[in-house]
Curated annotation (Swiss-Prot):
Transcriptional activator that mediates abscisic acid (ABA) signaling. Can regulate the expression of a wide spectrum of stress-related genes in response to abiotic stresses through an ABA-dependent regulation pathway. Confers ABA-dependent drought and salinity tolerance. Binds specifically to the ABA-responsive elements (ABRE) in the promoter of target genes to mediate stress-responsive ABA signaling. CDD domains: bZIP_plant_BZIP46 (cd14707). PROSITE patterns: BZIP, BZIP_BASIC. This is bZIP transcription factor 23. Residues 303-317 are annotated as: Leucine-zipper. Residues 166-185 are annotated as: Disordered. Residues 275-338 form the bZIP domain. Keywords: Abscisic acid signaling pathway, DNA-binding, Nucleus, Stress response, Transcription, Transcription regulation.
Amino acid sequence: MDFPGGSGRQQQLPPMTPLPLARQGSVYSLTFDEFQSTLGGVGKDFGSMNMDELLRSIWTAEESHAVGAATTTTATTASVAAAEHAAVGAPPVQRQGSLTLPRTLSQKTVDEVWRDMMCFGGGGASTAPAAAEPPPPAHRQQTLGEITLEEFLVRAGVVREDMSVPPVPPAPTPTAAAVPPPPPPQQQTPMLFGQSNVFPPMVPPLSLGNGLVSGAVGHGGGGAASLVSPVRPVSSNGFGKMEGGDLSSLSPSPVPYVFKGGLRGRKAPGIEKVVERRQRRMIKNRESAARSRQRKQAYMMELEAEVAKLKELNDELQKKQDEMLEQQKNEVLERMSRQVGPTAKRICLRRTLTGPW
């Protein structure tokens, strides 16, 4: 873009190098006029839009239209730029949706931003020509419709270099990929048993004829543990067998075998107490269940005996009732037979002599 006091378009650009957004074949390579003609349906002018609306229009055009320019000139420029990008091997920029606007710039219109760029851009470029050089010829001032979207966004401060050029991780070399990573440093331990750095389980000290020897039984083979002796050093081969020195003075008791932190056949006192408590509780539960069954059985037997007794009493009372009814019936029949039978007295009227005649 040409400004008064500048020699050309490229001399008037700010020191920051424009980002290769147009090399991706996007709408950023179009000018405002070409972008306006490409959209066609936008009724609002770009100059009256604020920066937020402009970015939304650009994102909508990127999603709805195919990659490339609308005219033959822009298509050729995009293909050449893509070839240069493939030859240079520059990494692709981020998606346009990740562009951010400063808070003071988001509500400004495109015309206001363009006027600010014209005011501040001309003054900074006026100091570029030297005193010995002849004054450059005056050029026509570039308008907003002739500037590309990429250049406008770069000069407005929307696009940042750290946003569009992500760091490229270095490719691993074949030698580095083939070599395995070094193992982490192992912590030094007082005693090494085989290839393990874990402390071995300790064993009660072995009694010698002239002192005590503190020993340990290891899990790994070939590891040696130094044993301290008042007279001569005695070493162990990791399996409980003493080497180096007179073994006749050792006690005849064998070295106990260590199995998972304890002696074989011996359980921890806490586990023994838990098992014993569980067994006692189980025995108590069984005894309580047996007593409950006995009480229930005795109660059932008592109820059965009482029912049998009541049945016998009922039968006796039934018999007595039948006898009483029979006796009453017999008495009634006997009384009736006395009144009707031959032995009954006949009651009749007799004539009495009441008169002298």
